[in-house]
């Protein structure tokens, strides 16, 4: 045995390492030494400040926090499973090397906020948004309860923390969804804060530890296999606290965004296209029937922003939108005619099965596909004047061979996402797709073409049980 390494392991384990422990853990001695020399007093002080600033309503004494921290950092002393020791080392290493920069910094005085608040009065466009939403109320309500609807009592505290986090880390974390619209229109209500960031795993692990040390409760991180790079944090009752999509830094830099009070939000034009896409998802149409007012105010806010900032004239002239689309039932591929716009492609093949798209791209021997990850939920490839891409939502039919207008518009919006993200020509097709929303024909759904089934196992990080499977 190397005496220096053995001493580091002995100091960490509180016992002299067995031969098996030495040989399996010696590769981790640098990380273990970081844990050994970690200043727990300063860390406990940061936790107390975090608790005072963001969780002041929770009953927890300073001695409770200290006891919880010291108990966790001595956990390895009574652990003999090599697998569990590896998990403890990994989680402790993340905590001691990242917490101060990720969450601890939120307790210090932040930079001055440069007020850039832009409030939008939606009164003039709310009638249009109401008509649009009512035209989409064409489904019956399902009794199915989605898991994320079970909201933790900690959401309010975490939201307060997230507002500060978004300001401090606005180069690698941005928000979208209802909170971002609330910043544009205070009448928009929000639940949790939807975020995209480049270090989701580290952030959520640090947040899980913060909650554990303050509340004493075990929280669990889940990775969902059918959502790319998505993680959700759940409390001890399996209730939703916060979720996050992880994206690459180059994707972050590609996303158009606007700054409001030091917080970056995804440009509402991108969010509007994503909303039009989502309307093609059958369970989202069911949500509209349950609570149309919620969708109306969000849609109106997006429409008003885009109308003003992109100079859209609402006159009902929708040109070629939604674009002509035909569906091949056997191949599960939609062909979209795009040659009427100034796009770098003349037509588009929309695949409903992602694996089939990947296979066909491979056969094309083309290596210039671009993937915007969760922003578009698909890669895009342009080859020989044809775009190849994947559509992740259900497709609605109005007859056996005719795609419902809600879905043709959703497909068109998916194509416009590419144009927006690549800074291509957008004004005319954007004007057309928005004007196509005026005087929508309310049409029943003949059939729903299901989206492809994603397989895989949930990953989990459980601090209490020393489990990491992703």
Curated annotation (Swiss-Prot):
It holds the Pfam family Pox_polyA_pol. One of its GO terms (molecular function) is ATP binding. One of its GO terms (biological process) is mRNA processing. It catalyses: RNA(n) + ATP = RNA(n)-3'-adenine ribonucleotide + diphosphate. InterPro entries: PolyA_pol_cat_Poxvir, PolyA_pol_cat_sf, PolyA_pol_nucTrfase_Poxvir, PolyA_pol_nucTrfase_sf_Poxvir, Poxvirus_polyA_pol_cat_C, Poxvirus_polyA_pol_cat_N, Poxvirus_polyA_pol_cat_N_sf. Its EC number is 2.7.7.19. It comes from the Viruses. The active site is at 192, 194. It is an enzyme of class 2 (transferase). Keywords: ATP-binding, mRNA processing, Nucleotide-binding, Transcription, Transferase. Belongs to the poxviridae poly(A) polymerase catalytic subunit family. Heterodimer of a large (catalytic) subunit and a small (regulatory) subunit. Polymerase that creates the 3'-poly(A) tail of mRNA's. This is Poly(A) polymerase catalytic subunit. It comes from Swinepox virus (strain Swine/Nebraska/17077-99/1999) (SWPV). The gene is PAPL.
């Amino acid at each position: 045995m190397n005496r220096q390494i053995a001493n580091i392991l002995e100091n960490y384990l509180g016992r002299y390492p067995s031969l098996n422990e030495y040989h399996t853990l010696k590769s981790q001695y640098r990380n273990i030494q970081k844990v050994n020399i970690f200043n727990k007093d300063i860390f406990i002080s940061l936790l107390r400040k975090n608790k005072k600033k963001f969780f002041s309503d929770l009953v927890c004494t300073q001695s409770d926090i200290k006891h919880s921290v010291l108990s966790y950092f001595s956990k390895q002393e009574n652990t003999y499973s090599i697998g569990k020791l590896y998990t403890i080392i990994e989680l402790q290493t993340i905590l001691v090397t990242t917490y101060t920069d990720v969450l601890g910094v939120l307790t210090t005085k932040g930079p001055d906020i440069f007020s850039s608040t832009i409030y939008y009065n939606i009164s003039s466009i709310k009638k249009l948004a109401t008509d649009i939403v009512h035209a989409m109320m064409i489904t019956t309500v399902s009794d199915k309860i989605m898991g994320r609807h079970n909201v933790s009592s900690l959401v309010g505290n975490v939201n307060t923390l997230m507002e500060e986090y978004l300001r401090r880390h606005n180069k690698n974390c941005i928000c979208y969804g209802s909170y971002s619209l609330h910043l544009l229109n205070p009448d928009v209500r929000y639940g949790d804060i939807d975020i995209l960031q480049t270090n989701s795993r580290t952030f959520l692990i640090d947040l899980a530890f913060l909650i554990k040390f303050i509340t004493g409760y075990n929280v669990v991180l889940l990775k969902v296999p059918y959502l790319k790079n998505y993680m959700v944090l759940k409390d001890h009752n399996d209730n939703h606290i916060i979720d996050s999509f992880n994206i690459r830094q180059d994707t972050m830099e590609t996303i158009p965004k606007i700054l409001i009070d030091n917080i970056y939000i995804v440009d509402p034009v991108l969010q509007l296209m994503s909303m039009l896409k989502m309307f093609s998802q059958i369970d989202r149409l069911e949500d509209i029937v349950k609570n149309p007012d919620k969708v109306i105010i969000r849609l109106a806010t997006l429409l008003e922003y885009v109308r003003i900032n992109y100079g859209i004239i609402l006159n009902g002239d929708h040109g070629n939108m939604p674009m002509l689309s035909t569906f091949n039932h056997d191949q599960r591929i939609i062909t979209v005619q795009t040659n009427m716009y100034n796009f770098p492609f003349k037509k588009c093949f929309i695949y409903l099965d992602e694996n089939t798209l990947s296979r066909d791209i491979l056969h094309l021997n083309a290596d210039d596909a671009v993937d915007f990850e969760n922003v578009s939920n698909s890669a895009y490839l342009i080859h020989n004047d044809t775009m190849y891409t994947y559509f992740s939502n259900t497709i609605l039919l109005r007859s056996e061979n005719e795609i419902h207008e809600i879905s043709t518009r959703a497909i068109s919006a998916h194509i416009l996402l590419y144009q927006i993200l690549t800074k291509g020509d957008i004004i005319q097709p954007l004007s057309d797709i928005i004007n196509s929303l005026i005087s929508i024909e309310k049409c029943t759904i003949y059939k729903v073409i299901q989206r492809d089934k994603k397989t895989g196992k949930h990953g989990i990080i459980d601090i209490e049980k020393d489990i990491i499977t992703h």
